[in-house]
């Protein structure tokens, strides 16, 4: 499965422009996390990167696919990922990608680093977008790590962003919250034009 296949599935499942931007943000962040782990910790022999054959593109595809059917299933958590799973199976996606996509909404165990990563960065990208939208310019370039940290502590801000889920970066990914925010923000700023921010 290639990145282009993932983007085609988003079209087939009638994703809105804003949802596509969210999925791309998570995809870009997943690719950055792959590089982070490759640099910091070579993959363990048991395939902790999602499987011994998982590539950077696979990590990005997992990020792009994680919410592919969220709108078409009426935002129902019970139905979420079911349509995506069908599409991924039809196209011959790896079981590791399918499990990671399903795992982000508790429909499969998050046993791999890839599954744990998409679970943590899903909510953080949303929080960072919310931080950008309250800036006068509504641009990611105006957002700082410090401003995200401040908003993270303010539970009345972006209430839908699950802080506990974001904080799994610490015990599941062994990345401090500050470093996780910094990596995600930098990645999103690098791709700001593609994210419309």
Where are the regions that the model predicts?
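Amphipathic alpha-helix face/heptad-repeat signature
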Residues: 22, 117-120, 184
């Amino acid at each position: 499965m290639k990145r282009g296949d993932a983007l085609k599935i988003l079209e087939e499942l009638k994703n809105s422009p804003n949802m596509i931007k969210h999925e791309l943000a998570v995809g870009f962040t997943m690719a950055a996390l792959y590089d982070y782990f490759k640099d910091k910790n070579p993959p363990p022999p048991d395939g902790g990167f999602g499987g011994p054959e998982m590539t950077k593109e696979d990590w990005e595809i997992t990020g792009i696919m994680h919410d592919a059917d969220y709108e078409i299933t009426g935002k129902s958590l019970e139905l979420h990922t079911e349509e995506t799973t069908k599409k991924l199976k039809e196209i011959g996606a790896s079981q590791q990608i399918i499990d990671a996509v399903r795992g982000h909404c508790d429909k499969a165990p998050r046993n791999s680093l890839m599954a744990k990563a998409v679970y943590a960065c899903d909510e953080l990208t949303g929080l960072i977008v919310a931080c950008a939208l309250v800036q006068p310019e509504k641009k990611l370039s105006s957002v700082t790590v410090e401003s995200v940290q401040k908003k993270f502590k303010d539970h009345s801000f972006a209430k839908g962003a699950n802080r506990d889920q974001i904080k799994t970066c610490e015990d599941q990914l062994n990345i401090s919250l500050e470093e996780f925010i910094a990596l995600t923000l930098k990645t999103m700023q690098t791709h700001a034009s593609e994210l419309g921010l």
